[in-house]
């Protein structure tokens, strides 16, 4: 498994994108995707030779994430790309991580499977099995 991206929850994607561009030199690499399953709007940012950043903005129906961003938002999860989600999910579960979301199509990843786990210290982990991102701009 390798790190694919780190995710931050923001109150407003437009403002979040502008901040990451101004402060760290990141550029938006995907259009904004509305993820109906997770009730968020999503975009990815990149910078040469650096980790990809995913920004999420909650939709009105995502009360828990709305509460989080209303308190300032911030780090949400780290995502690992793996070859076999089912196998790695089982391995990580055997190591004590709690499965939050079983593998399901991820709208931000052109419907390739994603899964979520919870590790110690409140660390949310996403697993994906693709390099694809929906809505690529370049």
Kindly give the residue locations of the regions a language model identified.
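Short secondary-structure boundary micro-motifs
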Residues: 17, 27-30, 62-63, 81, ...
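Long, hydrophobic N-terminal alpha-helical segment
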Residues: 1-38
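Short, well-structured hydrophobic secondary-structure segments
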Residues: 38-41, 51
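Short, conserved turn/kink motifs that form compact alpha/beta structural patches or helix kinks used as
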Residues: 57-61
